[in-house]
């Protein structure tokens, strides 16, 4: 599951993993250690490699320069959340406000800070990051989709919240066959 920050990758990936009865790994939860210290690259790669050694998994997060080679080599599908910037910004602003106000623990004791909410530095603020990297993320993923080295992957590009809901519904197995169906509601689909 890839896309710009705030697009809903983690929410969709967790819901998809439940629907598919697959393991779920949120790359941010591995990468961001206590105090927002990044996990050393070698250890990050080792943990991701162990996760993708499994039979069925859903992973969310970009980290293309660090682990794309490991994840995409074992993947069969890349789901790309390519939502409009206005949708992403609305979501990430509300999400960040909520998390900061509630002091929600994200990963390993880390929490969003109020001072970062107002920062224009993309290295400090996830809101600034989402705004400043939206176009570049889209261009990078367009290039990856066109790259013949990724021809073994099915790219599913979702460009609206309605498309996301339809995708998740289509991934839900039918009760009789276990095969995906477009008619069955999927757990968490209304939250997307």
What are these model-derived regions, one by one?
Residues 19, 128-192:
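NTP-dependent small-molecule kinase module
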Residues 83-137, 177-178:
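A glycine- and Lys/Arg-enriched "phosphate-lid" helix/loop adjacent to the NTP-binding pocket
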Residues 1:
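Hydrophobic anchor at the beta1->P-loop junction of P-loop NTPases
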Residues 15:
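Active-site signature of alpha/beta-hydrolase-fold catalytic machinery across serine-
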Residues 23-78:
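Conserved nucleotide-sensing/catalytic segment adjacent to the nucleotide-binding pocket
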Residues 12:
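Hydrophobic positions on the alpha1 helix immediately C-terminal to the Walker A/P-loop
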Residues 9:
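Conserved lysine of the Walker
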Residues 5:
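The conserved Walker
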């Amino acid at each position: 599951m890839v896309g710009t920050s705030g697009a809903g990758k983690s929410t969709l990936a967790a819901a998809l993993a439940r629907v598919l009865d697959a393991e779920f790994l949120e790359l941010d939860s591995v990468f961001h250690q206590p105090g927002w210290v990044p996990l050393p690259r070698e250890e990050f790669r080792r943990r991701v490699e162990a996760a993708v050694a499994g039979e069925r998994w859903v992973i969310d997060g970009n980290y293309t320069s660090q682990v794309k080679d490991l994840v995409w080599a074992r993947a069969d599908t890349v789901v790309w959340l390519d939502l409009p910037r206005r949708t992403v910004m609305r979501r990430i602003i509300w999400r960040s406000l909520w998390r900061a106000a509630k002091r929600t623990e994200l990963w390993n004791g880390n929490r969003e800070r109020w001072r970062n909410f107002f920062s224009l530095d993309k290295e400090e603020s996830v809101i600034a990051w989402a705004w400043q990297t939206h176009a570049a993320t889209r261009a990078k993923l367009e290039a990856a989709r066109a790259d013949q080295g990724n021809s073994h992957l099915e790219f599913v590009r979702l460009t609206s919240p309605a498309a996301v809901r339809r995708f998740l519904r289509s991934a839900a197995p039918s009760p009789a066959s276990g095969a995906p169906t477009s008619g069955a509601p999927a757990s968490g689909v209304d939250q997307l």
